[in-house]
């Protein structure tokens, strides 16, 4: 009888250790942006696109414009962040890296911005301010359909607005590239 009980306890211990071994999948996902820049995140998402989903793009800001690829945006210029990407100038001191990817013909068709928030505790506050700033914009040349704001990893905020189908493709590409992607806001802008 002691052998049977010892065997049962051993099996229970073995099963519990085995079951606990696969439980830390979230830790790897939370760190999937470690060592990445804002441009890297956009490049990784863009690389997932099929050829028939791609369109003419440009990236960067007025001083760092890149054709056919994402580009870096100067985070010390709050006015440019706001004018180009809808990022609130008052929150510029909370980020230390940014990048953009835009439809070459019309920013309202598609614009994506990635922002590295210096303190992880500020991610939600940055996302809130970004949402409010974009929702209150006066649009020219038509309204974008959707605004979606994500957190990626511990310190990145990604905002994308534009035509619904293009925004949906970007969302799929970002989630495919980064398992830590969480949707914070999904708003209709086509009032």
Q: Where are the model-predicted features located?
A:
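Positively charged n-region of N-terminal signal peptides that target proteins for export
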Residues: 1-4, 9
């Amino acid at each position: 009888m002691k052998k049977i009980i010892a065997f049962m306890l051993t099996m229970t211990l073995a099963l519990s250790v085995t079951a606990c071994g696969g439980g830390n999948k979230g830790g790897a996902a939370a760190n999937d942006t470690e060592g990445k820049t804002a441009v890297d995140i956009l490049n990784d998402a863009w690389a997932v696109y099929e050829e028939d989903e791609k369109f003419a793009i440009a990236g960067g800001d007025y001083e760092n414009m890149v054709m056919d690829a994402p580009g870096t945006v100067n985070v010390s210029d709050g006015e440019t962040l706001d004018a180009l990407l809808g990022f609130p100038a008052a929150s510029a001191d909370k980020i230390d890296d940014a990048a953009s990817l835009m439809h070459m013909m019309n920013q309202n068709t598609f614009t994506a911005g990635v922002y590295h928030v210096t303190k992880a505790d500020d991610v939600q506050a940055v996302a809130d301010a970004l949402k409010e700033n974009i929702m209150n914009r006066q649009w020219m040349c038509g309204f974008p359909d959707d605004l979606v704001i994500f957190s990626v990893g511990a310190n990145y905020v990604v905002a994308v607005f534009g035509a619904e189908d293009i925004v949906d493709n970007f969302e799929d590409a970002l989630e495919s590239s980064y398992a830590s992607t969480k949707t914070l806001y999904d708003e209709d802008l086509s009032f």
